[in-house]
A protein has these predicted regions:
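Claisen-condensing/thiolase-fold acyl-transfer catalytic domains that form or cleave C-C bonds
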Residues: 51, 55, 82-83, 87, ...
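Short beta-strand-loop/turn "lid" adjacent to the catalytic site in phosphate-handling enzymes
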Residues: 71, 75-85
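N-terminal glycine-rich anion-binding loop in soluble enzyme alpha/beta folds
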Residues: 2-47, 53
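Conserved beta-strand-centric core segments of catalytic alpha/beta enzyme folds
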Residues: 1-20, 116-189, 297-336
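Glycine/charged-rich beta-loop-alpha catalytic/anionic-binding loops adjacent to active sites
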Residues: 38-40, 74-76, 96-109, 146-151, ...
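Short acidic capping loops at alpha-helix termini that bridge into adjacent secondary structure
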Residues: 68-74, 102-104, 133-134, 248-253, ...
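Acidic-glycine-rich active-site phosphate/pyrophosphate-binding loop
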Residues: 25-34, 85-99, 137-146, 206-210, ...
Length: 336
């Protein structure tokens, strides 16, 4: 079975604090910290472009695996759509930047669920194609650029930050074994959260350039639908991924969960019969899109929370909407 042989992340140095967000949005700082669950978050510096950050995380993952870039057969690029340039296959640039000269590269997208999708796709490719031995799953994120803090409808997106994550996935050998996964998509949310201009439906013009930001079209309707579907869908993909791994929820030792509001995070753990010791709440990082799962794994390893043989699940969600999860069996030492 395919294994994660190395993990890497990159976080920009600039940070935005709860006080900064409160000042920009008009919310009380206590609401930002306690309800939204944001103490601070990394935001991009002048040179922290999506492809640049992805390359830095990729080099860290390769170093963690003890491998050179030349051994990579394919680059599964999970860069966010908001990247260096529009209409651009950023994975090809990523492969070039890290020196993966043998690899073919491509981009995939499932918004903040792209990390889980990338791991599953890499494992499936290695299983199906005998000519592939090593895949790199990597991508960066900086959708914090697209947030207008004066818009209360995107308050649930005030946690968006910046950074990158990467995983070296190999056909076999030492590493953390990838197990079962589960996905749910619900297209009834497809038109709810988007940038309304800059595409073929509403081309960018001098008059509408100010609308180039993430917006919610029907906040009341979306909130009502989410209330009945989001937590149940999180629980469904978690439980199904665990079951497809031949395990039980009680076997879980770490839930690498995306950053969401504290009440939702706690509700998911409680429904699973797990406690706060089974996860890390990313209050000091915010939501770095598809990177959250990679970051949570690294933090858990660095904090000594993971031991050989532990069952771990990465769980994510992305606007559109998707909920997904993938399990792995932790094998050995701390991630770098």
């Amino acid at each position: 079975m395919a294994v994660i042989a190395g993990l890497g992340t990159y976080l920009p140095k600039p940070r935005q604090s709860a006080a900064d967000i409160a000042g920009a949005s008009g919310l009380p700082e206590a609401v930002v910290r306690d309800k939204l669950g944001i103490h601070s978050k990394p935001v991009p510096g002048p040179e922290d472009h999506v492809s640049t950050m992805a390359a830095r995380a990729s080099r860290a993952a390769l170093a963690d695996a003890g491998l050179e870039a030349q051994v990579v057969d394919t680059v599964v690029c999970i860069n966010e759509e908001h990247k260096d340039y529009p209409v651009w296959t950023s994975g090809i640039q990523l492969a070039h930047d890290i020196g993966a000269k043998r690899a073919y590269a491509f981009d995939i997208g499932q918004k903040c669920g792209s990390g889980v999708l990338g791991l599953k796709l890499a494992a499936d490719m290695l299983h199906a194609d005998p000519h592939l031995d090593t895949a790199l799953v990597a991508g960066g994120y900086r959708n914090s650029d697209l947030i207008d803090y004066s818009d209360p409808d995107v308050r649930f997106l005030y946690n968006l930050g910046a950074g990158a994550g990467a995983a070296v996935v190999r056909r076999s050998g030492p590493g953390h074994t990838l197990l079962g996964s589960s996905f749910v998509t619900d297209g009834s949310f497809a038109g709810d959260v988007l940038v309304p201009v800059g595409g073929s439906r509403a081309p960018l013009t001098p008059d509408n350039v100010g609308e180039y930001r993430l917006q919610v079209r029907d906040m009341a309707g979306m909130r009502e639908r989410m209330a009945s579907r989001s937590v149940p869908n999180f629980l469904h993909v978690l439980r199904e991924a665990v079951a497809r791994s031949g395990a039980q929820v009680a076997d879980l030792r770490h839930v690498a969960m995306l950053h969401t509001k504290r009440s939702a995070h706690d509700a998911i753990l409680a429904e699973l019969g797990l406690g706060p010791e089974h996860s890390i709440y990313l209050a000091d990082y915010g939501h770095i899109g598809q990177v959250d799962g990679f970051l949570s794994l690294q933090l858990a390893a660095q904090q000594g929370r993971l031991r050989r043989g532990d069952l771990v699940v990465i769980v994510a969600a992305g606007i559109g909407y998707v909920w997904n999860a993938i399990c792995l069996r932790w094998e050995g030492g701390d991630a770098a």
